[in-house]
Amino acid sequence: MEGQQHGEQLKRGLKNRHIQLIALGGAIGTGLFLGSASVIQSAGPGIILGYAIAGFIAFLIMRQLGEMVVEEPVAGSFSHFAYKYWGSFAGFASGWNYWVLYVLVAMAELTAVGKYIQFWYPEIPTWVSAAVFFVVINAINLTNVKVFGEMEFWFAIIKVIAVVAMIIFGAWLLFSGNGGPQASVSNLWDQGGFLPHGFTGLVMMMAIIMFSFGGLELVGITAAEADNPEQSIPKATNQVIYRILIFYIGSLAVLLSLMPWTRVTADTSPFVLIFHELGDTFVANALNIVVLTAALSVYNSCVYCNSRMLFGLAQQGNAPKALASVDKRGVPVNTILVSALVTALCVLINYLAPESAFGLLMALVVSALVINWAMISLAHMKFRRAKQEQGVVTRFPALLYPLGNWICLLFMAAVLVIMLMTPGMAISVYLIPVWLIVLGIGYLFKEKTAKAVKAH
């Protein structure tokens, strides 16, 4: 598989270290750096428990996807499994849903990049920075998969070092007495208890917490280009979860011990507050580099992910055939360009449209992710049933099957209910049936076209 091939094969150019950090980088993004502030305000120190619960659900989903991917490492990942074990509409819907999800995320991250650049150069409009990084990252992804893996590896390294530095520095402030009189582990329970707003405060935040873990399923997408999927996928799946729990739970435990949670404001990153102790300008610049890297890293993953998903859809016959080709370096150029074109349109819409349109798009991301994870779990149940009937013993079985699947599905349902009760998020839940109808129409059109072609 390692040779230069032309036609319809992706090149296996990703090593285990790339796959580990692609998943880790996908999960350490804006959610941890900025999103945790509003959760802390609502849930207090209980956010730590929230991340543990969401981390467990994410791990179950990753293991379900991991089991399928180790057996059949193909491009298109779970849309392939939904297609093969559940039915052609399920494959069509899950693939396109995932593609749209990451186009929306890509657009959001590019906008964030523009805002971060303004920290240094306020006179540069956001759309200019977004356009520059849009061109650079897409150009890099057009070279070959190894370059993508290498770039994502270093992006993720920067984020990981920043979080580790924060944990070490925070722990030093805490235990050396240099953190001031307010720094004490008792902050975790002194200010109105571990769950100051009761369990309700935590439950209402589970939707936002869950989306910090979105991106973990990137491990499944990398399978077709992994050097040795039978070994690297189980390893990446099992190790990533420990690391994420250390990064999320570790950093938040240190953060919330350093000062009372009541001092966290929704419009500032909690990380800015803690690094503030180092002295203003150095910290502000260092942190801005980190959040900029985080946004670029997630956008980089989006470009990779979208092109591979579209490639998989084309191979299944769910997208135009021209998208199922790769160049002599094994890069799916057409799918990268098509995904880029749509993302560029989003940047334009984002530039022209008021903030409300952008808020709505982000709420759609939330719903698309729920559909995505639920479909992984459902496709896995069908996959396991089929394998049991064939008498096949899988090499990397998921945890707690089938109970684990039902736990995940109940969790997704609960998240949707929570979103219905959350102002600004409810609209995206109402749009789920509309989106499914659009997918249904697209599927019928595809079937009709395929029949017409056969008739000729």
UniProtKB/Swiss-Prot annotation:
It catalyses: L-phenylalanine(in) + H(+)(in) = L-phenylalanine(out) + H(+)(out); L-tryptophan(in) + H(+)(in) = L-tryptophan(out) + H(+)(out); L-tyrosine(in) + H(+)(in) = L-tyrosine(out) + H(+)(out). Residues 1-18, 63-85, 138-154, 222-239, 292-332, 379-398, 446-456 are cytoplasmic. The lineage of its organism: Bacteria, Pseudomonadati, Pseudomonadota, Gammaproteobacteria, Enterobacterales. Gene3D superfamilies: Amino acid/polyamine transporter I. It is found in: Cell inner membrane. This is Aromatic amino acid transport protein AroP. It comes from Escherichia coli O6:H1 (strain CFT073 / ATCC 700928 / UPEC). One of its GO terms (biological process) is amino acid transport. NCBIfam families: PRK10238.1 (NF007594). Keywords: Amino-acid transport, Cell inner membrane, Cell membrane, Membrane, Transmembrane, Transmembrane helix, Transport. The keyword Transmembrane helix applies. The chain crosses the membrane at residues 19-39, 42-62, 86-106, 117-137, 155-175, 201-221, 240-260, 271-291, 333-353, 358-378, 399-419, 425-445. One of its GO terms (cellular component) is plasma membrane. It is a multi-pass membrane protein.
